[in-house]
Amino acid sequence: MKTRTIILFLALLMLGGAAEAQKVRFGKYFTGGTLRLDCSREGSAEGDSVWVSRWIDRESAWHGSRTQLLDPFDNGDYRVEMRDARSGRVIYSRGYSNLFREYKDTPKGRTVKARFEETLLLPMPKRAVNIALMRRDGQMHLVDQTVLPFDPSTAKLEYSMRQGERSDLEVHGDPAKKVDVVIVAQGYDDESDQKLRIDYYRMKEILFGKEPFASHRQDFNVYGIKGDAEAQYGTFGADRYLMTFSLWRLHDLIGMTPCDYIVIMVNNTTYGGGAIYNFYAVSSLHTMAEYVLPHEFGHSFGGLADEYVDEELSYSNLHRTAYEPLEPNITNLTDFDSKWKSLLPQGTPIPTPPNPNTPRTECGPLGVFEGAGYSATGVYRPAEHCMMRDYAPFCPVCLKRLEEIFSLYTR
């Protein structure tokens, strides 16, 4: 408990100063409603373009934080910024990743163009803004890819019209001060309502059975939506990779339900799952869901990297580059000072020799262990074992980032 308290204190201290300096007053710039952007992204590793297919008035209150409007993390391959048209000031920002980022690293994606859906939920502005869709350049800097003018007084908006069958599973308070999680239940018919209730409960308790989510249970609201998210196994040729390409349909199902994070629960006992940062997480009902769901939520919620090794994946060289990985829990030692170096016990060797005697259910001492981000060499992780690698709890480095994310939604 003492260690968790220290981690939380450090996380809040780091965010506090920067947040106060950049404070955006919600009532000055925003109506209190929600603007939904349905975007299309098409391309390959050779290049891509992005455009807005639909502007939608979600006809619901803004359920995100009204005080933490600027994303303090340099995480995610993409970012959306809303800029006041008069002053140019950034009044809202969030980093995220998407399926296209993974597609372009596959053999097909290196040359063959494909189109992908994205959905962004933004606070509805009171006056004209410019919405910048940003991506990483060759040096990993965020640059504008396209800038979309939006004036709420003249924009032609569509409206949210449908929603799946909703259940309020566990609600602890004002959505603007909670982490709002929507569990979308796929594969349930009208005859399986009792099973659906049992499965909702199981998934909810799996998540709240792991730290730091257990200690933050009161900081969550959890909702259920029954409907077909069109998630499918075999994404990008990996049998266990269970994802959906139908982002617009997914958000149609969610409708006006408060939503910061999405978990797709697939009524299938075949092993599978997947997740993308600030996009969604997926888990089947396989017996290993006890580990799959928290692991995938770590990707979606915290932007954490996989720490396991799988050289057969087409993107196994993803992090062996001249630039430090974006994810906080892996490093290629290009800029280790920006990672967990300050958390290491004095005298820790870098790299740290492996300790094969560490039980797989324990993290072991903090260090710099080779083998992470799918690569057996050249990429390093903070602990022998971690939820992002195998069957241990989240390690201290992952816990620190997860605590920091909570502060974006609960303050």
Residue ranges and their predicted role:
Residues 110-175:
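Extended acidic/polar, glycine-enriched regions
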Residues 291-307:
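Active-site recognition of the HExxH zinc-binding catalytic motif
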Residues 5-15:
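Sec-dependent N-terminal signal peptides
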Residues 155-211, 224-228:
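Fold-level signature of zinc-dependent metallopeptidase catalytic domains
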Residues 195, 273-296:
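Short pre-active-site segment immediately N-terminal to the catalytic Zn-binding motif
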Residues 219-277:
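Active-site-proximal segments of metallohydrolase catalytic domains
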Residues 22-117:
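N-terminal prosegments of processed precursors
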